[in-house]
Design a protein with these regions (language model features):
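Non-catalytic C-terminal accessory region of glycerolipid acyltransferases
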Residues: 3-8, 43, 64, 76, ...
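Soluble or luminal CAZymes and related metallo-dependent hydrolases
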Residues: 15, 50, 104, 179, ...
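A conditional alpha-helix N-cap/helix-loop micro-motif detector
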Residues: 102-105, 129, 156, 177-181, ...
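Conserved beta-strand termini and adjacent loop/short-helix elements that scaffold enzyme active sites
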Residues: 107-109, 150-152, 177, 253-255, ...
């Protein structure tokens, strides 16, 4: 019975998203924006698990001093921001490149474009802030012909195909997080060719992430971006995003250099910690635009489940390395240890949707 209900729910979810894409692109923008804001308000008032986790995460950001009422006001703004993200995702296919460029306020754009123009690749780790899909469409509109990212394969499969097609239609190259694709090898190839790779990195969805200090607590984050920078020599440039009134804001931060000393693992860990520090500053400046409705801090995690996930991740790495060795090596000719360094195979986070924001559990923070 549970499988039947799950299948029915999956079909309903896929149909809902298809309808949203069709409708939002056809109704007046002001109407659609109002509807999504109301949906965000309803989700916030329901105080489901997702909103409660959002408030728990925001408490780490703002500290103990703000009252419960002030924290609730912040989470309310956060759910409205999350609703705006979803509205804009559905609206992106009809937003012109001219508007994407005109309405973006970005610090550090020339830094990134200069790096790419020199022929050097760049890997951009980013948190689930603002509108990361819009930011991707914006960089394409700025003249970058294409960039590569990784996303989880959503369920049902029809929804996964739709999201892959949506992002590919915007100019993204999307690699599935599962399915036997040699992701690290492909990403490394793109970077060595002077390409751009963007990887959401503020939450470990694999169990194999790097432990970092984050707002004074332990958390696990994706280390794949740092591993790629160490492996390929690409520039590691963290990005933070936010909503700037009706416009969009972004900051492409200065490159995090590879440490001169230490083992490969130690270098990746140190660079990932620096990424976390950049994320801290960006989130603290715009906490309402951090759409983290899931557990991210170690204190909130089920440690038994985390240990099981880590064991699964290690087994997957070993299996992938053995398979690649049997086949003569990975796509980029790296060793099994190098390929295993891309610990955060996901990168994109599983789809929650705005409605699930009121009752989220262990899913991701967005597609």
């Amino acid at each position: 019975m549970s499988k039947v209900l799950s299948a029915v729910r999956g079909r309903v979810t896929a149909a809902s998203y298809a309808a949203a894409w069709w409708l939002v692109c056809r109704v007046p923008e002001s109407w659609g924006r109002w509807v999504f804001q109301q949906a965000g308000e309803i989700a916030w008032r329901r105080q489901g698990a997702g909103v409660q986790l959002l408030e728990a995460n925001l408490r780490r950001v703002v500290g103990p001093e703000p009252s419960g009422k002030e924290l609730r006001a912040l989470s309310r703004a956060g759910m409205h921001s999350y609703a705006r993200y979803w509205f804009e995702v559905f609206r992106l296919p009809v937003i012109s490149a001219e508007r994407l460029v005109a309405d973006m306020r970005c610090e550090g754009k020339d830094r990134l474009l200069g790096t790419l123009a020199s022929g050097r690749g760049a890997v951009l780790p980013l948190p689930h802030m603002g509108n990361w899909d819009q930011a991707g469409a914006w960089i394409i509109a700025c003249g970058v012909p294409r960039f590569t990212t990784v996303a989880e394969r959503l369920k049902p499969e029809s929804l996964a195909r739709r999201f892959f097609a949506f992002r590919e239609g915007l100019g993204f190259e999307v690699l599935p997080a599962t399915g036997g694709v040699q992701r690290f090898g492909i990403l490394a190839q793109r970077l060595r060719a002077g390409g751009l790779v963007c990887l959401p990195a503020d939450r470990d969805v694999t169990g194999g992430g790097i432990e970092v200090d984050f707002f004074g607590e332990k958390a696990h984050m994706m280390g794949g971006a740092a591993a790629l920078a160490v492996q390929t020599g690409a520039a590691l440039m963290p990005v933070t995003l936010w909503f700037d009134g009706p416009l969009w804001g972004a900051h492409i931060h200065e490159e995090i250099p590879v440490p001169g000393e230490g083992t490969r693992r130690e270098k990746v860990a140190a660079m990932t910690q620096q990424v976390a520090r950049v994320f801290e500053a960006g989130i603290a400046e715009h906490p309402e635009d951090w759409h983290m409705l899931q557990r991210v801090f170690a204190a909130d995690l089920d440690m038994a489940r985390l240990a099981a996930a880590q064991a699964t991740a290690r087994a997957a790495e070993e299996a992938e390395g053995a398979a690649a060795a049997a086949a003569g090596g990975a796509a980029d000719g790296r060793s099994a240890a190098d390929r295993a360094a891309l610990n955060g195979r996901g990168g994109g986070g599983a789809l929650d949707g705005l409605a699930d924001g009121a009752d989220a559990s262990e899913g991701g923070s967005g597609p």
